[in-house]
């Protein structure tokens, strides 16, 4: 690819930014030399690794790669039998510490997550912790080996300390001698050539026997090693030699261990430097909120909300650019400082960044094409040495572009063919654009020439664009508007700035009528565009509000459905429980009947328990009724159309009947239920199909019991021939069944006789809470041998 364009589009500045996020020196160099590539699959792979690293950064912060060192040279020396020094060993230790840290980060960042493109790299890291720990144990710094690096070194250094103490004691003894002290310049011990000496006055040289190792610059002081410590210094020197030999053994042993792990170290360095590079790209993307664009080889560009990465993100106005699909050339017109050049550079720079595997500062679903070459003629690139004019400089560059451009090229021109006669310049510009159009090159060009606007309007595959300008504020908005040619606004701006209107009108009269009409047409189109855009914003606002209300309604309906299902479920559970309790009560009643019928307990006890059971049954009946009302409310819709004779279920009574009259204005109508005709409201009815029983559809098993009861319970009971206890037990159960079956009244035949049975029956009726009133039968009803009881 043409490398000259890197500087023109400021791609090199992006690489400098990228290198600032790298930790390793080798990675920094790699960042600064990063170039765009043209292989689609490799580009997608690079974008994927950057995206996965960015995802990890957002999810689990980052990890430091500081401490990575290139160990290739050290490992190569080990191959030829050399040993490593402390600096090299500490760098290897540093590399292993980074490996351990990064390995842990890779594991924690992906806990409970699926594998990504970086998982293999993290898995390939081998920290070799034992080697790292051994190096840290033995080497304290580049200049210091630990005493306990080996037992022998510990022993030698202990001897050195002992010898030092002996020498210092001997020299101190000499200095404390009053005679010797007069020969010394200072009462201090010094070291020369690795041997302990005393500073002796030059004139007292013969008074202190020993070996002279040095003298001061003035010659007034001689540094003499007294004979009393010569042998001790010799022994100390031997100990230092032994110490160095032992240190070399320790370093050699560590070097051997490094050599044993050379393959792992090579792999760790390669992986860590690769991850350092990938995370540098991710951190760069994070700094400008970058995204991975979609790539194609069809020349289609669709940058959504693109921003120039070198401009202040808080101030830059995002642009939308579509190019290469419906049209292959985009001609941008408009006033200076309106953002035309920035738009050109943004498209070119984002293309280079994307093909280099870098995320671009744009919105999701942005699309970039892969180009074999990117050409740009932007700015004043004339050479003083070449003595070229502005026009000649640009034309020289354009000639080179025309020689190399093809259908896999992106060509960018700023003020194409400016700097010469406008008529000739416009003609040249159109011809150059036409040639590039024939090549199939994707082209963007900025211009002030009105002729190029006409060229774009009259040529297939060429589109106009402009950078919006606010005439009221005399400032550009920096928005790129595709499909609309730009207007110079010279007259409007001059008028706003106070230029005499007569001068402006005179200037207009000097313009060709066709040109003036064309400019007026552009102004009209721009006004219409702004109106349409404003209306579109309002429509979008309404649509957003409608979507919001729709979502709220759907959520409300969902809550209602869930509540309805919950009510039905709880109702069924409660109904089942009530029926179970009722069954147990019935069983207990039967057991008590058998028990008391056999005379095993007093009558008062039986009546007491019967009364308690009846109260419980009444309570269960009320609960079941409430549940059925709630169930009906949750599941019921009133019938829309009723005809006389339709089968219906009266929810409040849980009885099946037929429509006897049509509903009135209030929705009230008469329903015939057996011998009972009742006035009900239409909202209390459910229209039944002939093939669906009301019990099955609306009442569950409880409704089945009630319906069967209403069909089987007689309105009369005959107690003649029964003992008092038997009669009362039968009557008590009969009254419960009749009440449950919704009978309004019953006829109790007890006979006249002695009146004892009648008296017992009346006593039971008096105690029964469901009985509203009772009386002996009148003439024709059975007279005193019958009692008529009416339910509440």
Swiss-Prot record:
Keyword annotations of the record: ATP-binding, DNA-binding, Endonuclease, Hydrolase, Nuclease, Nucleotide-binding, RNA-binding, rRNA-binding
Residues engaged in binding ATP: 334-341
PROSITE patterns per UniProt: DNA_MISMATCH_REPAIR_2, SMR
Leading EC class: hydrolase
Molecular function, one GO term: endonuclease activity
Assigned EC number: 3.1.-.-, 3.6.4.-
Superkingdom, natural source: Bacteria
Subunit structure: Homodimer. Binds to stalled ribosomes, contacting rRNA.
PANTHER family xrefs: OS10G0509000 PROTEIN, OS10G0509000 PROTEIN-RELATED
HAMAP family membership: MutS2
Protein family membership: Belongs to the DNA mismatch repair MutS family. MutS2 subfamily.
Record protein name field: Endonuclease MutS2
């Amino acid at each position: 690819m043409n490398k000259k364009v890197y500087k023109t589009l400021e791609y090199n500045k992006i690489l400098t930014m990228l290198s600032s996020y790298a930790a390793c020196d080798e990675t920094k160099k790699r960042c600064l030399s990063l170039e765009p590539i043209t292989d689609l699959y490799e580009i997608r792979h690079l974008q994927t690794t950057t995206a996965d690293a960015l995802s990890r950064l957002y999810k689990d912060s980052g990890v430091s790669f500081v401490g990575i060192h290139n160990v290739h040279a050290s490992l190569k020396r080990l191959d030829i039998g050399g040993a490593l020094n402390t600096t090299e060993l500490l760098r290897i230790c540093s590399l292993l510490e980074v490996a351990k840290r990064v390995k842990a980060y890779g594991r924690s960042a992906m806990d409970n997550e699926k594998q990504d493109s970086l998982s293999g790299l993290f898995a390939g890291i081998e920290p070799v912790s034992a080697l790292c720990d051994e190096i840290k144990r033995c080497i304290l710094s580049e200049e210091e080996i630990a005493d306990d690096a080996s037992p022998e070194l510990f022993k030698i250094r202990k001897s050195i300390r002992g010898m030092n103490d002996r020498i210092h004691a001997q020299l101190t003894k000499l200095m404390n001698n009053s005679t010797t002290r007069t020969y010394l310049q200072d009462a201090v011990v010094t070291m020369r050539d690795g041997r302990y000496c005393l500073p002796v006055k030059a004139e007292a040289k013969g008074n202190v026997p020993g070996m002279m190792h040095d003298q001061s610059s003035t010659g007034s002081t001689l540094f003499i090693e007294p004979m009393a410590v010569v042998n001790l210094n010799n022994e100390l020197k031997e100990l230092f030699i032994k110490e160095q030999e032992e240190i070399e053994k320790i370093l050699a042993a560590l070097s051997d261990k490094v050599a044993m792990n050379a393959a792992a170290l090579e792999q760790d360095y390669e992986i860590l430097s690769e991850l350092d590079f990938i995370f540098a790209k991710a951190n760069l993307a994070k700094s400008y909120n970058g995204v991975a664009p979609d790539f194609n080889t069809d020349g289609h560009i669709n940058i959504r909300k693109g921003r120039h990465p070198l401009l202040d993100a808080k101030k830059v106005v995002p642009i939308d650019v579509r190019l290469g699909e419906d049209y292959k050339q985009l001609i941008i017109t408009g006033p200076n400082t309106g953002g035309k050049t920035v738009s050109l550079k943004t498209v070119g720079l984002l293309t280079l960044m994307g093909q280099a595997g870098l995320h671009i500062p744009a919105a999701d679903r942005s699309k970039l094409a892969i180009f074999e070459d990117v050409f740009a003629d932007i700015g004043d690139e004339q050479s003083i040495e070449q003595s070229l004019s502005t026009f000649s400089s640009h034309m020289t560059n354009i000639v080179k572009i025309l020689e190399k451009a093809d259908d896999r090229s992106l060509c960018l021109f700023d003020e194409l063919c400016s700097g010469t006669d406008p008529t000739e310049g416009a003609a040249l510009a159109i011809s150059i654009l036409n040639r590039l159009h024939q090549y199939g090159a994707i082209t963007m060009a900025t211009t002030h020439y009105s002729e190029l606007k006409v060229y774009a309007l009259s040529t297939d595959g060429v589109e106009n664009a402009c950078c919006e300008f606010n005439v009221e504020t005399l400032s550009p908005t920096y928005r790129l508007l595709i499909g609309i040619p730009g207007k110079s606004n010279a007259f409007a701006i001059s008028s706003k700035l106070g230029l005499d209107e007569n001068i402006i009108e005179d200037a207009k009269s000097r313009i060709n009528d066709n040109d003036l009409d064309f400019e007026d047409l552009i102004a009209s189109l721009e006004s219409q565009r702004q109106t349409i855009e404003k209306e579109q914003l309002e429509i979008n606002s309404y649509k957003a509000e409608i979507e919001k209300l729709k979502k709220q309604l759907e959520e409300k309906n969902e809550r209602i459905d869930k509540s309805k299902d919950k009510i039905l479920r709880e109702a069924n559970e409660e109904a089942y429980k009530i029926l179970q309790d009722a069954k147990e009560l019935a069983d207990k009643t039967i057991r008590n009947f058998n028990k008391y019928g056999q005379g095993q307990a007093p009558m008062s006890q039986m009546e007491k328990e019967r009364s308690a059971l009846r109260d419980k049954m009444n309570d269960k009946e009320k609960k079941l009724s409430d549940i059925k009302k709630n169930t009906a409310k949750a599941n019921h819709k009133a019938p829309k159309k009723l005809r006389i004779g339709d089968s219906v279920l009266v929810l409040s009574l849980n009885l099946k009947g037929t429509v006897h009259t049509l509903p009135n204005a209030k929705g009230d109508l008469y329903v015939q239920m057996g011998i009972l005709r009742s006035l009900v409201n239409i909202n209390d009815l459910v229209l039944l199909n002939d093939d669906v029983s009301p019990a099955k559809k609306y009442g569950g098993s409880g409704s089945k019991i009630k319906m069967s009861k209403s069909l089987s319970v007689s309105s009369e009971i005959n107690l003649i021939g029964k003992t008092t206890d038997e009669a009362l037990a039968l009557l008590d159960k009969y009254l419960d069944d009749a009440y449950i079956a919704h009978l309004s009244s019953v006829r109790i035949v007890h006979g006249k006789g002695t009146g004892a049975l009648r008296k017992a029956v009346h006593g039971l009726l008096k105690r029964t809470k469901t009985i509203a009133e009772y009386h002996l039968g009148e003439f024709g009803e059975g007279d005193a041998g019958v009692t008529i009881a009416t339910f509440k």
